[in-house]
Amino acid sequence: FDVIEFPAILEFEDEDGGLIEKPLWPEFFDLEALLRTKASMPVFQWNAQYQQKPTAEEASIVKREWWNEWEKETPPACEYIIMSLDAAAERHNRADFTALTTWGVFLNEETSAYNIILLNSIKQRIEFHELKELAMSEYADWEPDSFIVEKKSSGVALYQEMRRMGLPVSEYTPHRGSGDKLARLNAVSDIVASRLCWVPQTRWAEEVVEEIAGFPFMSNDDL
């Protein structure tokens, strides 16, 4: 059978690889109105109701309700900070984003157990010089104890350059095949299921939770 989708906001790419958003029915729903609606509801609800991209909760490896919400404005004092980079192959490849996430390990005083919190998430389509600037800026801001770069695509050049600069960056070389990310997520799913992971109440954190909940069925799996 054929699946016909009518997303409320259509996404196109310009000649420079930039993203262009246009409303499906501008005479009735202009882009500003749709973006206001998008900002007013959870990401999973927007994707399902307006973008025709629902995610099946029962099929999720990592479920949304397993995450704890960090309600305070500032994150806890972290004993160990980890940054992870998944670099896109090319900016004009519309399917790929560059994803940079920062995580912290902290002692939960209520449970006397070590927990993990998402400190920041950036997902963009960028060129290598922009990637280098972004990585160096985030590194300076967070001063991570560990910076893991997926050694593929533009991540290879970034890893080599940061090593030459004497920065403590580690490489991760993925195996070939689509099952590698699935195996990695399965390996850490119990940590989230044990309610040891926290996310702040921000839009970018919500997008991380939604993308993980939709894996491996979502079109993008960069985060």
Model-derived regions: residue spans:
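Anionic group-transfer/hydrolysis microenvironments
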Residues: 88, 122, 152
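Hydrophobic, well-ordered secondary-structure elements that form the walls
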Residues: 50, 86, 100, 135, ...
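Nucleic-acid-processing active sites and adjacent nucleic-acid-binding tracks
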Residues: 101-149
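ATPase catalytic-site recognition across NTP-hydrolyzing enzymes
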Residues: 12-87
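C-terminal nuclease/phosphodiesterase catalytic domains that cleave nucleic-acid phosphodiester bonds
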Residues: 44-53, 91-94, 101, 153-223
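Gly/Thr-rich phosphate-binding beta-strand-loop-beta motif of the actin/hexokinase/Hsp70
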Residues: 75-106
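Signature of the SF2 helicase/ATPase Hel1-core->accessory helical subdomain module
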Residues: 1-13
